From Swiss-Prot:
<dbReference type="GO" id="GO:0009228">
    <property type="term" value="P:thiamine biosynthetic process"/>
</dbReference>
<comment type="pathway">
    <text>Cofactor biosynthesis; thiamine diphosphate biosynthesis.</text>
</comment>
<keyword id="KW-0378">Hydrolase</keyword>
<dbReference type="InterPro" id="IPR016084">
    <property type="entry name" value="Haem_Oase-like_multi-hlx"/>
</dbReference>
<comment type="subunit">
    <text>Homotetramer.</text>
</comment>
<dbReference type="InterPro" id="IPR050967">
    <property type="entry name" value="Thiamine_Salvage_TenA"/>
</dbReference>
<dbReference type="GO" id="GO:0009229">
    <property type="term" value="P:thiamine diphosphate biosynthetic process"/>
</dbReference>
<feature type="binding site">
    <location>
        <position position="44"/>
    </location>
    <ligand>
        <name>substrate</name>
    </ligand>
</feature>
<feature type="binding site">
    <location>
        <position position="167"/>
    </location>
    <ligand>
        <name>substrate</name>
    </ligand>
</feature>
<comment type="similarity">
    <text>Belongs to the TenA family.</text>
</comment>
<dbReference type="InterPro" id="IPR027574">
    <property type="entry name" value="Thiaminase_II"/>
</dbReference>
<keyword id="KW-0784">Thiamine biosynthesis</keyword>
<feature type="binding site">
    <location>
        <position position="141"/>
    </location>
    <ligand>
        <name>substrate</name>
    </ligand>
</feature>
<dbReference type="GO" id="GO:0050334">
    <property type="term" value="F:thiaminase activity"/>
</dbReference>
<feature type="active site" description="Proton donor">
    <location>
        <position position="208"/>
    </location>
</feature>
<protein>
    <recommendedName>
        <fullName>Aminopyrimidine aminohydrolase</fullName>
        <ecNumber>3.5.99.2</ecNumber>
    </recommendedName>
</protein>
<feature type="site" description="Increases nucleophilicity of active site Cys">
    <location>
        <position position="47"/>
    </location>
</feature>
Amino acid sequence: MNFAETLERDAQPIIDEIYQDHFIQELLKGDIKKEALRQYLRADASYLREFANIYALLIPIMPDLESVRFLVDQIQFIVNGEVEAHEYMADYIGENYNEIVQKKVWPPSGDHYIKHMYYNVYAHENAAYAIAAMAPCPYVYAMIAKRAMKDPNLNKSSILAKWFEFYNTEMDPLIEVLDDLMNQLTANMSETEKNEVRENYLQSTVHELNFFNMAYTSEKWQFGGERV
């Protein structure tokens, strides 16, 4: 078992919790509050913009040209490709996706997640720390979708089933490259450094759990500080 595989194994209990939580279970059944999906789409639009920016920041510290090309491709995918999955949710809501995300939200859970990733870009010269903070995002979505496609409770007649179909396959190439990078960049690390990278990965998996819950509860700042 390589290093990336151990991270994915260690994250599994958190992913199980994400799958069993309200947001994914109601999405699975094709019966979820429309306001929860609006909150998710608005927060995710903000999140993905920053995700693309972080990819751009990593370009100068990539180990080879192939990795740079990969990051450029991922920026393009975030800008153009992943909108398809969002459109399915917008169709369920019955509103235009671009109109939904015109209202900007910056909820606490999204804020903490994004800052966790930025911190690891700037705090460490080795890109493994930042990649460990970013890699759980596609992995969590892929694992949830693959599990959902085998779940008898999946409402295949709902437009929301297409959301699971999208993530069932679209994340696989990205996960493979991130895993390869993770293994390459941690190969000469000490056990202490590897444990720090592992902690980053697990923290981001918890951030994924909190992000879905943020959408379901329409999480807002309680004492000011909401970003416009």
